[in-house]
Amino acid sequence: MFSKNKHNTKFIVIACVIVVLILILFCFDFQNIQEIIETINQLTNNQNPSKNTASEMSGMRRKIIFFIFNFFGKIILASFIISFLLHIKKNAQIKRLKNKLSLWSKLSFHVSQIGEEVLNELPIGIVLIDISSQEIQWLNPYASFILKNPEINSPLTQINENMAQLISTSDTIPKTIITLKNQKFECFYKKDLSVFYLFDATEKEQIKHLFLQKTLAIAMIAFDNLAESLIRYDLSEQSQIQGEYLSALSDYIEPYESYLKQLIDDRFLLLLNRQNLDKMLENKFSILDTIRNISHKYQLKVTLSMGIACWNLSYEKLATYSQNAIELAQKRGGDQVVVNIENEKIKYFGAKIASLSKQSKVHARINAQNLVDILKKNPHCFIMGHTHTDLDALGSVIAFYKIAATIHPENNNYIILDEEKLDKSLIPVYHQLIKTESKKTLNIITTQQASKMIKDNSLIAVLDTQTKDMLNSPELLSLTPNIVVVDHHRATEEIIPSIFSYVESSASSTVELLVEVMGFLEKEVHITAFEASIMYAGILIDTNAFIYRTSSRTFEVASKLKDLGADAIEVKSWLRKDFDKVLEINKLISEMEIFMDRFAIIQSSEIYENRSFLAQVAESVLNIQNVDAAFMIAKIADNKIAISARSYNEINVQTIMEQMEGGGHLNSAATQLEGTNIKTVTDTLKHFLKLEYEKGEKNMEIILLTDISNKGKKHEIIKVNNGYGNFLIQNKKALLADKANLAVIKQTQILEQEQKRNHELLMQKLKQEIDDKKITLDIQLGPKGKIYGKITLKQISEEFLKVHNITLDRKKISLESEIIAIGIYPVDVFLTDQIKATFFLNVTERKSK
C-alpha cells in the first residue's frame, strides 16, 4: 500500500512539471497573439492604404500561420507527453498486479498447506454436522480419533450427548467440557457454521481441579447443650464424659489431614482443604451418629453442630461464612452440619432427632426485654405473618399486636391481613373474629393500605416465618430497615435481614414464644377469650394435638391460654373435617403406594387449592401401622405441585423437602414446585428417599475414579450397595465395573504408567543438570557478622534461573537449616518423591562501594 502511494506521488509531481512547462511555452505564444492583434488594429485604423500596408498584411498572415502551426504543435506535443505518461502509469499498474498475482499464488500454496495442516495435523478436533438431522457430515482425523472413528451420518446423540445438548442452548458461542478417553476437551459450537471445535483441555482442567482441591475450608464445631447437660454430674464424671466426646471428635478428624483447635470448652475451630471436605461429605459426617450414641449411653441431650465454609475468599470473610453456617445449624435445632461451598447450594446433614430445647426462663426474659426495648423505640408497628395464613400465624399476629398495644396504647399498631391470602380453612374463623371484635379494635389493614402508611422509621414484625417468599406482603420490607422476626421453624439460608430475631426451633409454635414474652412485661396483656382460643388452636395444629415438638413449656402456655378463656370444644369444631373431605381422604389413602416398606406416597392429579387438606391426608396416613413417613403429592394450581410430608421417629422429612426446594420441621415439612409434573416429582422424591434410607440392597461392583476414604483407591474395583454405587456413578466418582469400562480403565492405567515412566526419565535428566551446580548470593552483614534480613527460596530460585537458565519450583526447594551467616550451603530440590537433586549456594558478603 505504501509503495503504491509513493508511485502515485511521483507521477503527480512529473505531470505537474510538464503542465508548468506547457504553460510557460504558451506564455511566449501570448506575445505573438498580442502583436497580431496590434497589427490588425493598425490596419483597421489606417485610412490611406499603401504598399507598406500590403507588406504588413503579408507579414501578419505569416505570423498567423506560424502561430497556428506553433500552437497546435504544442498541443499535439502536450497530448503525446500526457499519453506517454498515462501509458507508463498503466504499465506500472500492470506490473504491480502481476507481482501481486505471483505473490498470491505463492501465498495460496502456503495457506493451503497451513489449512491442511490445521485440519489434519494439529490437535484440534473439527466436526461438521447437518443441523436439521443432527448427524455428522464430516470430521477431521483428530476428531475421528478422539471420538472413536464414528461413521459419517451417525447421529450426534450416539457420539456424545453433551455435544448434542449444545445445539439447543441459547448462548452466543455455546461451550462445554466433555470427557473422551480419560481426557478433557473444551467443546465450542459455532451455530452459523454448524461446526464443533474440540481443544484438549486436560491439563487446564487438572490445574483447575487441583486448585479446587486445595481451597481452604473453615469449620466451626460446637457441642450443643454440653455444659447444661453435665451440671448434674460431679467434676470427675464431667471430665470423663467430656473426654469421651472430645476423643470421638479427635478420632473422627484425624484421617482428614486437618488442624483442630479448641477455642473454649464446647467450641472448636477446624481447618482443612476442599479435598478432605469432599471425603467428609461422602462419609455424611458420621461423627453426628457417634456423638448421638455417646449421649444415648449417658442419657444426655448433647449433640454436635458444625458450620463449614469453603470459598476462595480472604480468611476474614471465610471465617464469617463459617460462623454464619454454624449459627444456621443451631437455629435449625442443632445435631447437624451446614456446609456452604462456593457456587453450590447450601447442604444440610444430620438432624435425625428433634430440636433440643435450649430455652430457659432467663433466655426468655432476655429476649422479652430486647423486644420491649425495640417496641419502645418504634411506636409505629406493622405486624404480618406468612401467606396462606393459618391459625398459628393468625394467633401469633394477634399475640404480638397485644404486646405492642400494651407498650404503646396510642393505637399506632397495625395488623396486615389480606383476606384473599388466608388459608381457606381459616376464613370462617377470621369472619367470626371480625364479627366479635371488629377490624378497628385490632387495627387490621390491607397490604395496599400499609404501603401508604409505613415510613422509614416504622417497625415491621414478621411472625411464623423467616423466608421472604413466604411472607404475606414481602414488598413492604423495602420500606423500612427496622424489622424483627419471631419464629419457631428451622432456619434456612434465605432468612430475612432483621435488627432482632427470636427464633427457637424447639418451640411448639410462635404463639408459645410470644405468650412466654407476655409473662415478662411490666403491664398485664389483655387478651379476649376468642383470641385465646385462636392462639390455643395454633398450638394444637402445630403440635398435631400435642404430639410433636411438645415440651413442658408448651403445656404451661396452653394452661395459661385456658385460664384466659380458650375454648377447647370450639377449637375442636374449627378443626373438624366435612363429610366430603373425609370421603376424599379415604379415597386417596386407598390408592397410596408403600415405598421401601416404610414410606407412604399418595398421588393425585386433582387440583387442591386448600393446602391444609394435603397435610390432613399425610397425617391421616401416619395412623397406619408400619408407615414411618407419608408424602401427599398433588397440584395446588395448574402449574404448581405441592408435597406435604409427615413422619415419625428418626425419619427427617425436613431434609428431604429441603433437597426439593422446601423446608419445615423434623417431622413436618412441605415444598412447592413449578414447571413439572406429578410423575417427575414422585420419581425425584423416591430418589432422595433411596439415597438417604436405602440399606441392605444387593451389592454392585464399581471402579473408583478417585480415592474415597474407607472405600478404596483410584481405579480399584470395590463392592458397594446399589444406592451408594449409583450415587458415586452419578457424581462421576465411579464407573460400573462392566467389560467395556474395565477395558478402558486397563488402557488408562497403561497410559498412566507410561506417562509416569516418561516423567521419571525427564526428572532424572533434570537432576543431572541441577546436581553440583553453584550459585552465589551477595548479602549485607551487620556489625557482628549477622545477616540483615532473610534469604528466601524466591531469591534462590531466581538466582538459579539467572545463572543456569533452569526454573525451579520454590515449593520443591528445601534447606537443611536457616541461613544465618556467610558460607556454602547445600540446597535440595525434590523433583519427585524418589528423585532429589542438590546444588550449592555460596553466601558472600556484599562489598560496600
Curated annotation (Swiss-Prot):
Residue ranges crossing the lipid bilayer per the database entry: 11-31, 64-84
Single GO term (MF): rRNA binding
SUPFAM superfamilies for the chain: DHH phosphoesterases, L9 N-domain-like, Ribosomal protein L9 C-domain
Domain (GGDEF): residue spans on this chain: 214-342
Keywords: Cell membrane, Membrane, Ribonucleoprotein, Ribosomal protein, RNA-binding, rRNA-binding, Transmembrane, Transmembrane helix
Keyword Metal-binding: no
Start and end residues of each stretch annotated as Large ribosomal subunit protein bL9: 681-849
SMART domains the UniProt entry points to: GGDEF
Predominant location category: membrane
Protein family: Belongs to the bacterial ribosomal protein bL9 family.
Anything else known: The large N-terminal domain has 2 potential transmembrane regions and a GGDEF domain.
Name listed for the protein in its UniProt record: Membrane protein-large ribosomal subunit bL9 fusion protein
Biological source species: Aster yellows witches'-broom phytoplasma (strain AYWB)
